[in-house]
Amino acid sequence: RMLDYVFLCFFLGNDFLPHFPSLNIRTNGIHILLDAYKNIIGNKQDCFLLSKTYQTGIKIEWKQLYKLLLELSKNERNLWKQEYGLRSKWDKKPVMLHQKGTSKEKTELFQNTPVLYRKEEKYINPYQHCWEERYYQVLFSKNVCKENIISNYLEGIEWVSNYYFSGQVDWSWKYKFHYPPLLKDMIPKISTIKTTILPKRKTKPVPPLVQLAYVLPPIYHHLLPTTVDSTILDKQTGIPLHSNGLPNIEFQWAFCRYFWECHVKLPEIELY
């Protein structure tokens, strides 16, 4: 059961996958998951979300995951409404633009940006008809197919399981989006999965200095060792810059609580 508990927590978000707005760790997300697990799987003998054998290692039991997500999806819209209602309370609080405020007041205002400016969330509005379509319309690129989002997320569930439980992963894999698909939209796809879905591909982890080179703004590249290949640094040229040389970056904060949780929109950098 311990492995199942860890696996459940993947749906609350981690370093590799975003959390579901309807399953927020701040608003009883873990209890919602555990209640669904208790109702569907409980202590049934030989009934788990993950199985482990010497031959295959850790394996997702997709049939059981289907049942669990089906249970969660039945209440998905209500969970969205609850989360939306909690965040709507911030609309009643006046936004004081502390132009002459203290440094602490300005920092607090800045960090509260995601709950003070909720344009995208208000447009989605789960209380109104067709909110699901608006969710994908606002939070994903127009040319993205919903099926690709679903497949990519389900790959991610398997990838993260392999990463934490066996360490044998394709280091080139990534989840390509800032938000997950809706729970109900994953149900049809999961019902067709019988075995592993990730293609086997042998890759090496990205070297630490290369990782550092990719996250450092260009104006700080002089801090890197001279051994770092210049072609690596050249790949950052796609990031737009302000006139002062600092990166001109867009942020997306729908359903985030604090600004530091925002999703950063950056151009793709090919690693492999």
At which residue positions do the language-model features occur?
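Long, low-complexity, charge-dense
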Residues: 1-272
